[in-house]
Amino acid sequence: MTEFIPAGTLYHALPSPFPMKRGGVLHQARVAYETWGTLAADRSNAILIVTGLSPNAHAAANQANPEPGWWEAMLGPGKPIDTARWFVVCVNSLGSCKGSTGPASVNPATGAPYRLSFPDLSIEDVADAAADVVRALGIAQLACLIGNSMGGMTALALLLRHPGIARSHINISGSAQALPFSIAIRSLQREAIRLDPHWNGGHYDDARYPESGMRMARKLGVITYRSALEWDGRFGRVRLDSEQAADDPFGLEFQVESYLEGHARRFVRFFDPNCYLYLSRSMDWFDLAEHVDEQPATDSAIDHAHADALPASAKPQTGVSTADTVLAGLARIRIARALAIGANTDILFPVQQQEQIADGLRAGGADAHFIGLDSPQGHDAFLVDFARFGPAVRDFLQDC
């Protein structure tokens, strides 16, 4: 069991015990985070970034760690998220292996890694932990909450469970619930890991490690993170040179196969398999429609001034999750301004889900807009297609 923590990581100790949504508690748990920029005297210029499944908190280079981060082109002085103006915080998700407490962390009660004794993890737990970091920094209200991919789910849960925590929100390639296709893919990824004999019920080590299972899980993920349009343009049917091809008659032959293999091998030893299982399942469980029947965070679940924006079928229906009940869940969120952005080629979090987020937040009274970008790079476009995503983020933040 290994944790992979970047240099310069900061830590916030969560309240102990820290209750989990689906039962159980954590003791002496922590959240890893990093910061950029300077917090204004009135603490009004703070932005929080919540991430996808695998990133650490090192979104960009800073004084504590000059190494480029995973969102380097988006975050820094003069960049779309301009740290000359904004004080930016990025948190590593609870349940991860990148500094925050997760299955790879030591359980203080036993002195051994949690492994599968870690409590069931939900997106709501990740959101609550992030909110506690904001409070600990003395920030009463964020200028903007930014969430991408899984972080888009986390951001919505955070806004719903902690009313007033942000004035505005940017949801990038996120969703208000997991769709069947996405659940199916992640189920196969988890199965690949669990069927590897070296997984051993979660009891593996560096010598006996579920490398084959992790490699297959990562390949499945990468296929859904990009798009067929990109595969066609980038690889076509080009074959490997004879010296690159595998001796196995059914081994690597095409460039696209080699790309997947290389990508997977770079990942498998830098993310803990049990953490992968927990975070993956938390995404499948997330459904904002489940919050419709909860006690409202404000005086009414749906602001009467905007109730007409929702169809009649959006009234709470216990145990039933439909597009309308998702909209009703979104409409319970109180936010002044919001932007939902997605790539039209995204098959994992289809662009219709970002449009749904904008529609639901608008029904709750937000000045909410949706932008579907014609990027060929699928779900991962927000990590690489800065020419398209950068201007949208910059323009929105200029008015915050």
Swiss-Prot record:
The active site is at 149 (nucleophile), 346, 379. Pathway: Amino-acid biosynthesis; L-cysteine biosynthesis; L-cysteine from L-serine: step 1/2. GO terms for biological process: cysteine biosynthetic process from serine; homoserine metabolic process; methionine biosynthetic process. InterPro entries: AB_hydrolase_1, AB_hydrolase_fold, HAT_MetX-like. It is found in: Cytoplasm. It comes from the Bacteria. Residues 45-385 form the AB hydrolase-1 domain. Homodimer. This is Serine O-succinyltransferase. It comes from Xanthomonas euvesicatoria pv. vesicatoria (strain 85-10) (Xanthomonas campestris pv. vesicatoria).
